[in-house]
Amino acid sequence: MLVDEPASVLSIWRQALAIIRRYPLAALIPAVVLGSLGDAPYYFIKGEINLREEIVTSLTGAFAFYLYIIYVTYAEEVTDEAELGVERITLLGVLHELRQASPVVPTALVASVAAILIPRVAITLLLIPGLWLLTRWALFAPVISKEHLGPVAALKRSSELVRGHFELVFLTAALATVLEEAASHAGAVAGLVVTNSDTWGQWLGGSVVASLVMPLAAFATSVAYMHLRQSSQ
């Protein structure tokens, strides 16, 4: 069982990797779908971007963000399977877990506006307050998935869980959020350098890296929440 090991930064990352190794199909298939959809319209628009193309890009980006929230809540379901000792998750099992996660996605999406977008703006303006907010609210998605709270209550509950464990959450769940986005952009740059294509090359590089990093980020968040919830009971 995952809770047998005391919570620490290294143990959380190690357990997140263990879940991915145990369920590679369940971890990677949804991530590949999300990773490939991410910024595809942006990278494939050539020349000057007009208003219609900007709208399409914005809508697709919003849809990709919606899919990311699905993946984070889905990761919570898969973590539960690992906690129960399930040996493998089939393709049908993946679809089942996605269906299980989908009802809480709208609530999680609303909470994410505060939990992710506001800290990003704050980081742009002033680094420390943004990282502080990002860490305090980093556990909102698993809180909504498992405790069935509304957006505001989930943010408050996340802050309660983080209290006294700020460094642990900062170096796991908060770092995972930053790592996922930074790695995706780095992959796009690498794709451009390797292929010399600012369309399909950047898209391919970003998609591959996002597909690999996203599961680690999501499961690290889920495992961190699980440990802190157990310790608070």
Model region roles, listed by residue range:
Residues 1-233:
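Hydrophobic alpha-helical membrane segments
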